[in-house]
Amino acid sequence: LQLADALEQHMPALLRANKKDLAAQDPDNPRNDRLLLNEQRIKNIAASIRKISKLPNPTGKIISKNKLKNGLQVEKITVPLGVVGAIYESRPNVTFDIAALCLRSQNGCVLKGSQEALHTNRVAVQLIKKVLKENDLPVDCVTLLPSEREVVQQLFTATRYLDVLIPRGSDSLIQYVRKNSLVPVIETGAGVCHVYVEKDAAINKALDIVVNAKVSRPSVCNAVDTVLVDEKIAPAFLQRLQAL
């Protein structure tokens, strides 16, 4: 909760850093939307952190137990993973998401963001470390790595330091990490979202859904990529969709 409060209090510093990152990009690149922070998006990140803080503690839960014939009690208990490595692209909100989730689940995290979000991520992690220090927690349990691509190769072989590696981003990034990492990998979804328009669908409502699923934020990984249309409704639906 303190992290969410601190994020809102230090919003100007985060916005200044984000402007530096945006100024270094091609202004016509549609992917800049992934990098962009504004007041509302920062408030949304803070709200997400508050939701995470209210999640039940996932550690220390007894999943199963049984007693052996010799009297030994055997229990399966949830424990932290340890140190989580995260590789992700130019989405500053991911820095806060991963840090908050790892702290809630009593894991440390090593963050490898993209060069595009360098200044934003630095300020974000400085803010996180400030809150950790104020609560007498080890500040290095959230660590930001240099943004150079060479660092990724080092993460792949860091079996002594990382317990799991999580890539978050495009399908090409996820597959590259999965194929090359010696550290165990948790593979996330890569988007490629589909919308299916059924033959009895209400055309106006279906059009609204398809347009919103793509146009509202084209850069996010859960934006629609493929529209499948039943052949019985295809002529009418596709004509209306094309007219948009």
Task: Write out the residue ranges for each language-model feature.
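Short active-site oxyanion
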Residues: 83, 141, 161-165
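Glycine-rich, mobile lid/loop segments that gate access to catalytic sites or pores
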Residues: 36, 112-133, 147-157, 169-174
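ALDH superfamily catalytic-core signature
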Residues: 6-12, 90-93, 97-108, 123, ...
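Conserved small-residue-rich beta-alpha loop and adjacent elements
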Residues: 47, 51-54, 58-131, 135, ...
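General beta-strand structural signal in soluble alpha/beta enzymes
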Residues: 61, 111-112, 143-146, 166-169, ...
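A structured beta-alpha segment of the ubiquitous adenosine-cofactor-binding alpha/beta core
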Residues: 38, 51, 69, 73-76, ...
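N-terminal Rossmann-like NAD(P)+-binding subdomain of aldehyde/semialdehyde dehydrogenases
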Residues: 1-74, 101
